[in-house]
A protein has these predicted regions:
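N-terminal capping/linker segments that flank leucine-rich repeat
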Residues: 51-135
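Tandem repeat scaffolds
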Residues: 1-62, 66-68
Length: 135
């Protein structure tokens, strides 16, 4: 927890699955780094040089990061953008119950904003879903 990588040159580094929870990456060069499945929750990324289309979104119900415009981590779940867009209601519910079901449209809004508009599952517009999340 909290590794000091301030100003480190991690250009092209394979950080896939790395636990960078709480790491100090202030000013680090992460261009070209493979950050898929990396845990960046609580990491200090100020002035870090990140790969294209890489974002850390704070202030949501879950920690959210988008890596290389391809992978999205929400809480402890890390999947491709396409996988997130196609999940069934049951698959989302299995992640974190009703809380995840309520948050899922917001997550898709975030993905749409940062990556571009995409498909949404039909079940999101069902009356059954609307009733379930407003109970």
């Amino acid at each position: 927890y909290g590794a000091n990588l301030r100003g480190a040159n991690l250009y092209g580094a394979n950080l896939r699955g790395a636990n960078l929870y709480g790491a100090d990456l202030y000013g680090a060069n992460l261009r070209g780094a493979d950050l898929r499945d990396a845990d960046l929750c609580g990491a200090d990324l100020r002035d870090a040089d990140l790969p294209d289309l890489t974002f850390v979104i704070l202030g949501e119900k879950y920690f959210i990061s988008i890596t290389n415009g391809e992978y999205v981590r929400a809480g402890c779940q890390n999947h491709t953008v396409e996988e997130w867009r196609k999940y069934s209601k049951q698959e989302i519910a299995e992640m974190d119950g009703r809380k995840a079901l309520k948050f899922y449209p917001r997550l898709l809004d975030i993905i749409d904003f940062y990556i571009g508009k995409g498909e949404r599952p039909d079940w999101l517009t069902s009356k059954e879903y609307a009733d379930e999340v407003t109970e």
